[in-house]
């Protein structure tokens, strides 16, 4: 029997097709569409980065409102477009915060995304829409969860926090909340620290969420250990009754090889022969010799210790020296792995290619 239809508000730092750095964008682009197909009223908010093209995405002005941060009232705009399945997608317009060369890795990321989280909570009120659930993702929007619990008297939306990677926490110094956030004392930082948490946005979100979710049942167990909890394992253990893991899915509409516009040639489970032409196209695009009898190993990943890049960096040269294979890596991440992958590609020009960045094609 179907449950009640809910109003769900996603608060995210990135979502395809508007802004993408990692897997968070894929989930934030696909999950709202799946929920909408189930009959829920789903809406999405993210920052209006300079890379979000107004003409391409047909952005229109929806509202203006003020956000208080670091003792100042800042006027922001709310832009709107319709995404997949007719889902309203909103963008917080504040050029000083979001018109930057990159989405992340700015020296004031903590302030940028704290401002975004506070602005995101004001957006529903500005458009006259009251969500039943606010669903924040990772540290960038975790403050919205803490703020929601702290400032709403009486009935309020349920607060859900999904952690895609516990290693990235949005850490701050002990003095920062009082300097930056109005009524910071209501956020329960003392409760966070007493529960084994640390000074971080993610810890504030975990401590205040009605439900805490992560990307698989296995990862939900792993983050309870010192090896994978990155200093948050005690706090996560204390929220064990509210913690679960739900494995990420994929968007079958976007990633169907029978219709995917990014593929040079379409194929299906019943017709796989055309894949050979896609392989040749990948070899050309990567600058590798077109060899029909050589397997091509492809890898799309964030270049980080957590993804096993340290193991890959040691093993790959031997594989390429001893086996007749080609290897293509697509991704971004830690600078040392960029350097190592470039060195491997330079030493094995006919066998290895490193494509820096993310490209859905």
Per-region residue spans from a language model:
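Catalytic cores of nucleotide-sugar-dependent glycosyltransferases that transfer UDP/GDP/TDP-activated
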Residues: 1-361
